[in-house]
Regions:
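Hydrophobic alpha-helical connector segments
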Residues: 3-36, 87-90
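All-alpha amphipathic helical-bundle segments outside canonical DNA-binding/catalytic cores
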Residues: 16-17, 55-56, 73-89, 107-112, ...
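Alpha-helical elements of Rossmann-like donor-binding domains used by nucleotide-donor carbohydrate transfer enzymes
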Residues: 21, 25, 51, 63-66, ...
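Short secondary-structure transition hinges
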Residues: 27-65, 69-81, 85
Length: 145
């Protein structure tokens, strides 16, 4: 999973598009409802789940920061972002989406809530140029469905 995410982040020039492509990998790994490995770990093996959560940030944090810096350099993200802070906020928020007590799988589709979260996150950090790209990208996604 880590290698796939790093490959996506490295191969796609636009960090907004790369984040949505990374989301596809996350949804595939998280799976749907009770069958997802994340759900099983959180429910039946909470100690193992807690340990995995600790390792996530170290595994993906640097790649995420590089993507933020790429977006800042290209004018898609605001130039004054604190990349460490944004990384921590993003990962904490993403973890919250996977909390089965906050978002019970029988009530929430993981694909939809991750899309909403990414949109929420991006709107907080994009420039006018980035917002235009985001809105166009979202329109294209709607037209594909």
């Amino acid at each position: 999973v880590k290698d796939n995410i790093i490959a996506v982040q490295s191969s796609i020039d636009n960090p907004i598009k790369a984040l949505y492509e990374t989301k596809k990998i996350a949804v595939e790994v998280l799976g749907k409802k009770e069958k997802s490995p994340q759900y099983q770990l959180q429910k039946y093996y909470p100690a193992i789940y807690a340990e995995i959560r600790k390792k996530e940030l170290s595994a993906f944090g640097e790649t995420f920061k590089m993507s933020l810096k790429k977006g800042m350099k290209s004018g898609i993200f605001r130039p004054s972002l604190d990349t460490q802070f944004i990384t921590l906020i993003y990962f904490n928020g993403f973890r919250g989406l996977r909390d089965i007590e906050l978002f019970p799988p029988e009530d929430y589709d993981i694909d939809q809530i991750i899309d909403k979260f990414i949109d929420y996150h991006l709107r907080a950090i994009v420039t006018a140029k980035g917002l235009k790209f985001l809105e166009n990208y979202n329109t294209l996604k709607l037209n594909e469905n």
